Design a protein with these regions (language model features):
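Short basic helix-loop element that most often maps to the first helix and adjoining turn
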Residues: 15-34
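Conserved hydrophobic/aromatic packing and binding residues within compact polymer-binding modules
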Residues: 17, 31-32, 42-45, 73
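Short, basic-rich loop-to-helix N-cap that marks the start of a DNA-contacting helix
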Residues: 49-64
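Recognition helix of helix-turn-helix/homeodomain-like DNA-binding domains
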Residues: 36-52
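Short C-terminal boundary/hinge segments that cap the last helix of small helical domains
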Residues: 67-77
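Short amphipathic helical patch at the helix-1/turn junction of helix-turn-helix
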Residues: 11, 22-23, 53
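A detector for short, charged/polar N-terminal pre-domain segments
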Residues: 1-12
Length: 77
């Protein structure tokens, strides 16, 4: 687990990525290849029990590939 002040937000980010990935019909392996990330790292990012951070640039890349706004991935309602 990462040492962070924002565990809830990072967990929700991962869940949002997983939701939009599935809506696009992509597997973790496919998305990981498209964003130049290992499948293991993506899996950790999406896992509800994991707290994994990513760079802002990577967030923009994921949003672009999933055809959503970065704000959609950062929606914590």
């Amino acid at each position: 687990m990462s040492n962070t002040n924002y565990p809830r937000q990072l967990q929700q980010l991962g869940l949002n990525i997983a939701r939009y990935r599935k809506l696009c019909g992509l597997t973790q392996e496919e998305l990981a290849a498209l964003i130049s990330m290992s499948r293991t790292h993506l899996s950790n990012l999406e896992a509800p029990g994991q707290i994994t951070s990513i760079s802002l640039e990577k967030l923009f890349t994921i949003a672009d590939v999933l055809n959503v706004s970065p704000a959609s991935l950062l929606s914590f309602d």
